[in-house]
Every structure is written in C-alpha cells, then in structure tokens.
Amino acid sequence: MLTLGLESSCDETACAIVNEDKQILANIIASQDIHASYGGVVPELASRAHLHIFPQVINKALQQANLLIEDMDLIAVTQTPGLIGSLSVGVHFGKGIAIGAKKSLIGVNHVEAHLYAAYMAAQNVQFPALGLVVSGAHTAAFFIENPTSYKLIGKTRDDAIGETFDKVGRFLGLPYPAGPLIEKLALEGSEDSYPFSPAKVPNYDFSFSGLKTAVLYAIKGNNSSPRSPAPEISLEKQRDIAASFQKAACTTIAQKLPTIIKEFSCRSILIGGGVAINEYFRSAIQTACNLPVYFPPAKLCSDNAAMIAGLGGENFQKNSSIPEIRICARYQWESVSPFSLASP
C-alpha cells in the first residue's frame, strides 16, 4: 500500500510517500522564510504560502519516488492541531487529490504523528513505553501501553519547550527560529554561569514560563518587559545564558522521567518533535533514564509529511471505517489515542 501524506499545520509545507513497511519513498519539506523578519509565524502569510507551494512539493515527491498520483492507495492529511488556515489549505488539497484520483482520504493528528515518527524509525520497541512530544507548540508525556493504546499523563501548564527556546532567542537578539542558534551558542558557554532553576510543578506536568522570565531578567534587568529591546550583550554572555538556559529547560523534563518510568513500569521511551533534534536534550534524557530511548532521525524531528503518511497508513489498515475529517486548531487532550483513529 502506498500513502501520500500532506502536512501544513504551521509553516512547513510538506509531502511524502510511505509504503506499508514504513519505508519512506519520498519526503519533501519546504520551510517558509518569510516569517523570520516577524520573529514568529504569521498565520495569514503561512496559509497563503501553502497555497502557492503545495503543488510544487507534491510534484517533487512524486518525482522523487518515480510514481504517479494514480499509484497511490491512500491520501493522508494533517487535520489537527495547528493554524486553522494552514490546516484548511492542506485538507482541501488532500480532498481535491482524493476526489480527482478516486482515492481514500484519512485525517491525521499532528501530535500523534510526532510520536509515530520515533516508532516509525525504531526496531523492536518494548511496551509499555513512555512517550514525549517536545515541539514548538506542545510539550506532553504519554503512557503508551501498546502501539494502539495510550493516555496523557502530563503536559505543559504554559509555554511549550520549543516556544520557550524561540522566546529566549528573541531576548538574546537572535533571529527566528532560535532553537538551533541557542544550541550552537551553548556549546561554548558555561551552563553554570546563571542559576536558572528547572520548574518544579506537581504530578507529571511541566512549566517553562518562570524559566523564561528568569532569563528575561538576567538579560534586561528585573521587571523588564518582553517587548523592550534587547540590550547589547557580549558574545561571551550570550553563550553563558544560552548554556544555562538550555540546561534548565532540558532538566525541567528530564527530572520528571525516572518517577514516571517507575510509576508506569515503562520499558522504553519514544520521543518526537522539533526539540528532539537538540543533542544536549538527547543526552539529558538518556542520562536520566536507564532505558532504550528512541528518537526520530533528524529529518523526522521537525514537521514533516512522512510521519503523517506513515500514521495515516497504519490507521487505515487497522480500522474498518474512516471518520469524517474535522479540522481543529487546538489539541483535544481528552481524546488522544496514538496510532489509532482518534477524532478531535
């Protein structure tokens, strides 16, 4: 079975083709550089760009796989969560292809797909497992009993970890997206230069707003506004703040894991999302947990359509009926069920 996946939940326009063995035959991702000057994604610009770019990435994916639309068995498209305009563009492209080529169409949950990206690239994952999604929009922990059953056990109470990296980057005067730049600066900084403390919140939830404010005050002074211009700071100070912040942000998540693993008798860890590409984060997780940890390859950490096609194909094969696609901007935490057909 061949599945063509479409991803447009935010500012990446992506198309991929995946077969029933989880082999990626094509994986095309077009990032939108137009948002950099705004310091973040502008929803209207993102949706307009998707309209322009989708035909190109779809054609490139088909060319890369040396296939035709007629060869596809299924069209999978991101339906939730994300920017409503961007989601709508992707869904309507998917519907158009499905109707025109007389193919089946299935909607996919973007957050579930990030977890599936780790599962997709792994071999012999042992269950039950702990699942972590660490991205620009979401930070959450899941108990995965088996590949078709899991439940939410903790999530951020405020900012997502990836969002926090970008906001701290703005404080430091770095361009968007700031995550890779902070990681690079941190390599030459001292992580103990600033006493940023990882947040401690009850249960298995996370919090990053206090850390974000602490970094703001370290750069601009107490009671500063996030919108006030960043002062001129030395490269050495940039490096030290980046390293100290990165340590605290990663520790905020890593410190929770041993307790979760013990409580739920987890035998492995699956991690997905853009922050999963950060090498310091990977090391912190592996150090905190004496378990097999499965990260996606770098090309599947950020938003991509291969994870959408893979999860869509898996769901289609395991379910006898396909629910109607429902576009939804917000993630519906109470109705998650990875690798299954969960409607928002």
From Swiss-Prot:
Q: Which InterPro entries match?
A: ATPase_NBD (IPR043129), Gcp-like_dom (IPR000905), KAE1/TsaD (IPR017861), TsaD (IPR022450)
The record's listing under SUPFAM superfamilies reads:
Actin-like ATPase domain
Catalysed transformations (reactions): L-threonylcarbamoyladenylate + adenosine(37) in tRNA = N(6)-L-threonylcarbamoyladenosine(37) in tRNA + AMP + H(+)
What cofactor does its activity depend on? Fe(2+)
List, alphabetically, the Pfam families matched.
TsaD
Protein name from the UniProt record: tRNA N6-adenosine threonylcarbamoyltransferase
**Gene designation per UniProt:** tsaD
Organism placement in taxonomy: Bacteria, Pseudomonadati, Chlamydiota, Chlamydiia, Chlamydiales
* Family annotation (HAMAP family): TsaD
As for what it does, the entry says: Required for the formation of a threonylcarbamoyl group on adenosine at position 37 (t(6)A37) in tRNAs that read codons beginning with adenine. Is involved in the transfer of the threonylcarbamoyl moiety of threonylcarbamoyl-AMP (TC-AMP) to the N6 group of A37, together with TsaE and TsaB. TsaD likely plays a direct catalytic role in this reaction.
Entry GO MF terms = iron ion binding; N(6)-L-threonylcarbamoyladenine synthase activity
Similarity-based family: Belongs to the KAE1 / TsaD family.
Give the enzyme's EC designation. 2.3.1.234
Can you tell me which residues bind substrate? 133-137, 166, 179, 278
Provide the Gene Ontology terms for cellular component. cytoplasm
- Keyword entries, A-Z: Acyltransferase, Cytoplasm, Iron, Metal-binding, Transferase, tRNA processing
Q: State how the cofactor is bound.
A: Binds 1 Fe(2+) ion per subunit.
* Coiled-coil regions, chain positions: none
Q: Does the keyword Translocase apply?
A: no
Top EC class of this enzyme: transferase
Give GO BP annotations, semicolon-separated: tRNA threonylcarbamoyladenosine modification
Q: Where in the cell is it found?
A: Cytoplasm
List of residues binding Fe cation:
110, 114, 303
